[in-house]
Curated annotation (Swiss-Prot):
UniProt keyword annotation of Acyltransferase present: no
Function: Part of the ABC transporter complex SsuABC involved in aliphatic sulfonates import. Responsible for energy coupling to the transport system.
Subunit structure: The complex is composed of two ATP-binding proteins (SsuB), two transmembrane proteins (SsuC) and a solute-binding protein (SsuA).
Leader peptide range in chain numbering: none
Gene: ssuB2
Name by which UniProt lists this protein: Aliphatic sulfonates import ATP-binding protein SsuB 2
GO annotation, cellular component aspect: plasma membrane
Length: 232
């Protein structure tokens, strides 16, 4: 997928400017930057949810799916029904059952959202994102609302699912450690207007050890770039 955003404005105010981004098949890329720099807007452009901009998006064949910061589950539907909700022709129960097992929610197919923890609800949201067999999965701060331990487990789950289904991930995050742990590349964004100021290749094999000193060095580099981009 190739994305070019020459300019995106709201009420005459430029929020994104001069962005060129290519996503390779099976690649995991994180967008890292401050609130208000346009990360989520860029994600919406990639998803096709925002079309009022100057530029272009050239998609590869296949579906693009979106996982939001909040699970956004229908409270009156079961886990199974929430995962297959987008299918107007009646959902594929066998596929839904497989996804429920893959995200670690076996035994909860008939549970309502009120019976789920925050981490469990986000597992449902990820399964719902995978239901359409996407080639690209877009995630907007998907783990920001859960505790640190749950976040680490969900990060590992996401990596397993991405490898199993051979999908490309584009992730928005404020968490430097998360970006480096998950990604093949980290793109630092500055603001006013939002643009990509630095690309940081991670270049480490997966699965990664969170204690790897190379990750610490990359974190120092990322923090330097964020500082130079006037993010911190």
């Amino acid at each position: 997928m190739d994305i070019r955003v020459d300019r995106k404005a709201f009420a005459g105010h430029t929020v994104l400017h001069d962005i060129n981004l290519s996503l390779q098949t099976g690649e995991i890329v994180s967008l890292l930057g401050p609130s208000g720099c346009g990360k989520s807007t860029l994600l919406r452009i990639v998803a096709g949810l925002e079309q009022d901009f100057r530029g272009s998006v050239e998609r590869i064949q296949g579906q693009v799916a979106f996982v939001f910061q909040e699970p956004r589950l229908m409270p009156w539907l079961t886990v199974e029904q929430n995962i297959g909700f987008s299918d107007d022709n009646g959902y594929d129960r066998k596929w839904v059952s497989q996804l429920i097992e893959e995200v670690g929610l076996s035994g909860f197919a008939n549970a309502l959202p009120k019976a789920l923890s925050g981490g469990m609800a986000q597992r449902v949201a990820i399964a719902r994102g995978l239901y359409s067999h996407p080639t690209i999965l877009l995630l907007d701060e998907p783990f920001s609302a859960v505790d640190a331990f749950t976040r680490m487990k969900l990060q590992d789950l996401l990596l397993q699912l991405a490898e199993r289904h051979a999908i490309t991930l584009l992730l928005v995050t404020h968490d430097v450690d998360e970006a480096l742990y998950l990604s093949d590349r980290v793109l630092v964004m500055g603001s006013r207007p939002g643009t990509i100021t630095h690309e940081l290749p991670v270049g480490l094999q997966t699965p990664r050890d969170r204690r790897d000193p190379l990750l610490a060095r990359l974190k120092a580099e990322a923090l330097t770039e964020l500082h130079q981009a006037q993010v911190i």
